[in-house]
A protein has these predicted regions:
Chain B
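Alpha-helix-loop-beta-strand connector modules within alpha/beta enzyme cores
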Residues: 74-95, 366-375
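An alpha-helical appendage that flanks or caps ligand/catalytic pockets
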Residues: 5-34, 147-184, 222-342, 375-387
Length: 284, 387
């Protein structure tokens, strides 16, 4: 495909490359690190543009490619990407542009919703699928917490089982104007896709049977944002999906227990990579 | 100077533990606190006050739109305007305004305003507002589309009022195969339009370009001055005349016989409005995308305190409110008029938990003793230092 990727990063000590991909309407920021079978990681509502411990752990076994969704982190808001259906096409374009062949796709929360939609739309394009505390289903009996309405203190309380760990995601005790603007920008990007219908695609449930990828759904047992009923429903409707719950953890998942979430993800993907008997890193 | 009597229609009977246990009177404040009988009496009291305003000489009587809130009981301002239209004869019936950013169907607004224009025999003024942030939660409207919904709805409504033939409307947020408004408005080409401003330079330019009236929201004089200057500058650049009567200053006013009585009685009503009525979280007022990045930066850097943290004394000094004897109120408003150059005063007299008797007395004192002093100011012939 085109050579639009501009590598502006450095590769030392396993730290990621920073790249920008040109798209109509702007550019997308992504981080890439590690080697092995490619893993496309789709981030949650928070934490865009950052390489956390979770990423580094996965990158010990895989080539991790972590783009920021349009409007999040270092990515421009792409005017034409304004709904979940547009996001699916956006990521199909991105997979093609990067020349990834059936990458594993790992998505957390909002990113899990995108990953599931991607796997529904083009079951042939992805390898294995890992959904971490995925959003995206409309289950009126198990409402998703309205993060848009919470105060910063309330956000910490609902995201973390142990609020003492919140500094991973919210490092500044007193956020600067730029910190607040960056957070407002990420929430604005999320709201474009998730305000109404609220963090869901009402049609997704009936389409999940199309997913062909081996699938793991892993949820934090103490999720106060997306009740685990959502993960269970995903696992029920995706053919042969495996469901796991990780204790002592809130919806912040890979910010609260990075080793546990990296481990369960890597173990599942490694097993699939081996059983698929494909040469690793096929695309590069 | 033109005088407008503006009503919010608050529900003042909050529970005793409101300050401790309720983060806001809006969006999530349970409706079980709405006493059906007391609420019923309030509507009639408030409509009486609006009608009385015409009797004592106000040029306009104004209502507005709020949803799911004890701050204001008018989810549909057009219903209130309809109730007033045939009970009054002279005053402008001002809807300030319809929250066309939130409304699902803007064509319905065009239809209702056209009907109101007939009920009032051509006295309707049509304000358009985006709606407060919490209303985007309340009606599940995506706030990231607020600005474009407002602009598209405005364009559609104006075209619906002015087009003589059926037309098709297609814009990103609205699609109508047939727009063909019956009735047309009485006023030609359509009722006057009012738009509130809170600092956006796009809005100033938009209002000046169209010859609309620019009205302030509750803010300190220094800030309102920046907005009005910005509007006048935008008008200058477009080479249109910034008629002072198209600049409307919004302010709560309480008048009593003496300064002492006015502050003794008025303080709690003002505190109700700013410390209870306007008690709201950042997330409630500024949902994601409701503010552009530039406006949000400006807001964060402005250092404007939340209303709830602004004391009564600060509200007085800052020019958020005007309280006092008739002479003091007249002097203060003359001073503000000198500084701001407005030709229209949008007064809120029924403030917070004020009684009907206090409201009426305040209106009477204002009408008999303050209006005459201000009347000559702020006309096109009598321009001021501020402009």
């Amino acid at each position: 495909m085109t050579e639009a990727a501009i590598d502006v990063g450095a590769d030392t000590n396993g730290s990621p490359h920073e790249e920008f991909l040109e798209f109509p309407g702007g550019r997308v920021h992504l981080l890439r690190g590690g080697a092995g079978k490619p893993v496309l990681f789709l981030h949650a509502a928070g934490g865009a543009g950052q390489w956390h411990e979770f990423h580094a752990l996965l990158a010990q076994q895989f080539e991790v490619i972590a783009p920021d969704h349009p409007g999040f982190g270092g990515s421009d808001e792409l005017a034409d990407v304004e709904g979940i259906d547009d996001l699916v096409f956006h990521y199909l374009d991105l997979i093609e542009r990067l020349g990834l062949e059936r990458p594993h796709v790992v998505g957390a929360s909002f990113g899990g919703w995108i990953a599931a939609e991607l796997a529904v739309a083009r079951p042939d394009v992805i390898g294995s699928l890992v959904l971490l505390g995925p959003a995206g289903l409309r289950l009126p009996d198990h409402p998703v917490t309205d993060l848009f309405l919470l105060t910063p203190e309330q956000v910490v309380d609902v995201l973390f089982q142990d609020p003492a760990k919140a500094s991973v995601l919210f490092p500044a005790a007193a956020p600067s104007v730029d910190d607040i603007l960056a957070a407002y920008r990420d929430m604005t990007a999320l709201a474009r896709f998730a305000w109404f219908p609220f963090v869901s695609d009402p049609k997704l449930e009936r389409r999940l049977h199309r997913i062909a990828a081996p699938t793991l759904v892993a949820c934090p047992a103490d999720d106060k944002v997306i009740p685990v009923a959502h993960g269970k429903r995903y696992a029920e409707l995706i053919p042969d999906a495996r469901y796991e719950e990780l204790g002592g953890c809130g919806h912040a998942m890979y910010f609260e227990r990075p080793e546990a979430f990296a481990q369960i993800t890597a173990d599942f993907l490694a097993a699939r990579t081996a059983s698929a008997a494909e040469p690793s890193g096929a695309s590069r | 100077m033109k005088f407008v009597f503006f009503h919010l229609m608050p529900y003042p009977y909050l529970p005793d533990d409101f300050d401790e246990n309720h983060p806001s009177p809006s969006l999530t404040f349970p409706s079980k606190y709405f006493d059906r009988q007391a609420g019923n009496r309030l509507y009639h009291r408030y409509l009486d006050e609006l009608e009385y305003a015409e009797t004592v000489g106000f040029d306009g009587i104004a209502v507005n739109e709020h949803h799911q809130s004890a701050y204001g009981l008018m989810p549909s301002p057009n219903i209130m305007a309809a109730a007033l239209a045939r009970r009054t004869e002279r005053a402008k019936i001002m809807v300030l305004g319809n929250a066309i950013g939130v409304r699902g169907n803007p064509l319905r607004v065009a239809e209702e305003i056209a009907m109101l224009d007939h009920l009032s025999n051509g006295r309707v003024v049509s304000g358009f507002v985006r709606g407060i942030g919490w209303e985007y939660f309340a009606h599940s409207i995506n706030p990231t589309r607020s600005r474009e919904r407002f602009n598209e709805a405005h364009d559609l409504i104006i075209k619906a009022w002015t087009s003589d033939e059926p037309f098709q409307w297609v814009s990103p947020n609205y699609e109508y195969r047939y727009v063909n408004l019956w009735p047309r408005t009485v006023q030609e080409p359509h009722p006057p339009i009012y738009i509130p401003g809170a600092g956006s330079s796009e809005t100033m330019k938009f209002v000046a370009e169209h010859g609309y009236t620019y009205m302030s929201v509750y803010a300190p004089t220094s800030v309102v001055r920046r907005w009005f200057d910005g509007y006048r500058q935008a008008a200058d650049e477009l080479q249109v005349e910034a008629d002072p009567e198209k600049i409307a200053f919004s302010v709560p006013i309480y008048v009593a016989d003496t300064d002492e009585a006015a502050h003794r009685e008025g303080r709690r009503h003002v505190e109700w409005l700013f410390h209870r009525g306007l008690k709201q979280s950042f997330a409630q007022v500024y949902p994601p995308g409701y503010m552009s990045p530039g406006s949000m930066r400006g807001l964060l850097l402005s250092g404007m305190k939340p209303y709830t943290e602004t004391s009564y004394e600060e509200l007085l000094e800052g020019g958020y409110v005007v309280v006092g004897s008739p002479d003091s109120v007249a002097a203060r408003l003359q001073q503000l008029q000198q500084q701001l150059g407005f030709g229209q005063l949008n007064g809120l007299f029924s403030i917070g938990d004020i009684s009907h008797e206090e409201t009426k007395r305040s209106m009477e004192l204002f009408s008999s003793k303050v209006m005459p002093a201000l009347r000559p100011l702020g006309t096109a012939q009598n321009t001021v230092a501020g402009s």
